[in-house]
């Protein structure tokens, strides 16, 4: 089984995914980290040198390589579900979990976060607000195809993990060890 965590940048996919994997006794991977290790470049460097299209193609390669893995929690890049047929592929190959946050919380996290995110790097507060609201609106068409949606607003990592595990229990009413 594969669990794919999807959602906008800053939604907690990596943090929650790592915790969920530990709770399940599964492996955890972050697709951005895999790309960075494979290329020897940070995500901002990839965007600068190769552009977003190249990055999205690399994401798809990584996704395809992960489909053969089992008992794994996968934190995807925020845009991964929105390109090619990635979302459909993830839904066929496992359980997709959308970590939903309202734009204002995403904006706050991005403004005060310590991760260099190339799509928002040089935006002033107004530009950031506009970017998040417009991009989230476009991406939610894909995010809303997830099998499970968790409102992660005001949730600790532990409580968000518990919500996911509870939703998995409901999804697998035979209680398959979650």
Where are each of the predicted segments found?
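NTP-dependent small-molecule kinase module
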Residues: 19, 23, 137-178
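Walker A/P-loop
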Residues: 14
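ATP-dependent small-molecule kinase phosphotransfer cores
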Residues: 31-91, 116-118
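ATP-binding Walker
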Residues: 11
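Hydrophobic anchor at the beta1->P-loop junction of P-loop NTPases
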Residues: 5
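P-loop (Walker A) phosphate-binding loop of NTP-binding proteins
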Residues: 8
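Post-Walker A helix-loop "phosphate-sensing" segment adjacent to the P-loop in P-loop NTPases
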Residues: 22-33
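A glycine- and Lys/Arg-enriched "phosphate-lid" helix/loop adjacent to the NTP-binding pocket
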Residues: 92-140
């Amino acid at each position: 089984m594969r669990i794919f965590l999807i959602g906008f940048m800053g939604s907690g996919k990596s943090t929650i995914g790592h915790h969920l994997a530990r709770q399940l006794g599964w492996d955890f991977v972050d697709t951005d980290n895999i790309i960075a290790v494979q290329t020897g470049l940070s995500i901002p460097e990839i965007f600068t040198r190769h552009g977003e299209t190249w990055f999205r193609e690399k994401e798809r390669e990584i996704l395809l390589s992960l489909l053969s893995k089992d008992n794994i929690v996968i934190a995807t890049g925020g845009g991964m579900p929105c390109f090619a047929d990635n979302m459909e592929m993830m839904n066929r190959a496992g359980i997709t979990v959308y970590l939903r946050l309202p734009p204002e919380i995403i904006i706050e996290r991005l403004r005060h976060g310590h991760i260099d995110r190339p799509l928002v790097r040089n935006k002033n507060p107004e530009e950031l607000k506009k970017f998040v609201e417009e991009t989230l609106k476009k991406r939610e068409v894909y995010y809303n195809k997830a099998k499970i949606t968790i409102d992660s607003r005001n949730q600790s990592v532990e409580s968000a993990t518990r919500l996911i595990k509870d939703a998995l229990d409901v999804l697998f009413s035979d209680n398959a060890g979650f």
